[in-house]
C-alpha cells in the first residue's frame, strides 16, 4: 500500500518542482 502512494507523491512532487524550476 505504501509503494503506490509513494509513487503518486513522487510524481506530484516532481511536477511541482518542474513547475517552480
UniProtKB/Swiss-Prot annotation:
D-allo-isoleucine PTM positions: 2
Coiled coil: none
Localization (cell): Secreted
GO biological process: defense response to bacterium; killing of cells of another organism
Keywords: Amidation, Amphibian defense peptide, Antibiotic, Antimicrobial, Cytolysis, D-amino acid, Hemolysis, Secreted
Superkingdom assignment: Eukaryota
Primary location class: secreted
Family assignment from sequence similarity: Belongs to the bombinin family.
Known function: Has antimicrobial and hemolytic activities.
Name under which the protein is recorded: Bombinin-H4
Amino acid at each position: 500500500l505504501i509503494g503506490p502512494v509513494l509513487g503518486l507523491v513522487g510524481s506530484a512532487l516532481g511536477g511541482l518542482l518542474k513547475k517552480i524550476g
